Design a protein with these regions (language model features):
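Catalytic machinery of carbohydrate-active enzymes
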Residues: 1-301
């Protein structure tokens, strides 16, 4: 729910407990009953998966106008196939969401800037953890992603971290979570004491607050790219098995800030879960740390 903070008065949030009372078919029927009682005029399905399809079916049977997202699977399939790729920039997910609302006669202006409007989060709320900024350049680094095909090799990422950790005018914050990531962060912090791990120090809401005070975020094709985008921070994003053309670039992020290699085999996956058919993950391993450093320095100076 922290992602839905600062909603206008005419927007509400309803959570679905898919592991509890809304689990399974009976749970979905219960969720439908709860939603039906709210007397919606239109139903917009931005997800278009089995659960949401079932809810849409129930609403259609109740004569409610329903529109669902078109995910553009055909175009994405041509983009990632092994041979005869069609390298066409697919419609962004944001545009696809807006299209759903337009089908219902509700046109949308895509002019969002940040969950903090034109400002930033309350710095006093995070200063006890981060310390004062005092003219430093703050760089966030989110080195992990869900799938190997989206993770820049850690030994190469460490070279990027070492470069910026040596600069007293720069402070590096590491973003992640989980035991394995904590172990990697602990090893880096032992070598580079000026680097700070944020694991376990902030909740989602205050982590977004911190991101709003960064000068740049370095991220894989991962959730952190999108979180930083929500607070209007430039992101240097590294792309391996996946590609910005699939439509999943962060909100208002610039293509010039992407780091990727022009290989005939990529992209090979829409979401990055497929193993590398070459076996060497050259799309990531062949990216030089100097390329990443140059992109970051192009933003922070």
């Amino acid at each position: 729910q922290p992602l839905f903070q600062g909603l206008p008065a005419n927007v509400g949030f309803v959570g679905a407990d898919l592991t509890g009372k809304h689990k399974g078919l009976w749970g979905l029927n219960s969720l439908y009953s709860e939603l039906k009682a709210m007397h919606f005029d239109y139903i917009a399905d931005f997800h278009h998966v089995l659960r949401s399809k079932y809810l849409c079916l129930r609403f259609r049977l109740a004569n409610k106008p329903v529109a669902s997202i078109c995910k553009g699977r055909a175009g994405k399939k041509k983009l990632v196939r092994r041979h005869d790729k069609v390298m066409e920039n697919q419609k962004s997910s944001f545009r696809r969401y807006a299209d759903v609302l337009e089908k219902l006669g509700l046109p949308v202006l895509l002019n969002f800037s940040s969950i903090y409007g034109e400002g930033k989060g309350n710095f006093a709320e995070i200063e006890p953890v981060t310390g004062p900024k005092e003219g430093q350049k703050w760089i966030g680094i989110a080195p992990f992603a869900k799938h190997r095909g989206k993770i820049y090799p850690l030994e190469l990422q460490e070279q990027v971290i070492a470069h910026f950790a040596a600069n007293p005018q720069v402070k590096v914050f590491l973003f992640g979570g989980g035991k394995n990531e904590q172990e990697v962060f602990d090893a880096w912090i032992a070598k580079y004491p000026s680097v700070v791990s944020m694991i376990g120090k902030l909740n989602m809401r205050t982590e977004l607050n911190l991101m709003s005070h960064l000068d740049v975020m370095l991220s894989m094709d991962s959730a952190n790219m999108h979180l930083a985008s929500l607070v209007n921070i430039p992101v240097v994003s590294i792309w391996g098995a996946t590609h910005p053309y699939a439509g999943f670039m962060g909100w208002k992020q610039l293509p010039v800030n992407t780091v990727q290699l022009d290989l005939s085999c990529r992209p090979c996956s829409v979401y990055g879960q497929k193993p590398c058919w070459r076996g060497d993950y050259a799309c990531l391993r062949d990216i030089k740390p100097e390329q990443v450093i140059a992109k970051i320095e192009g933003i922070v100076g």
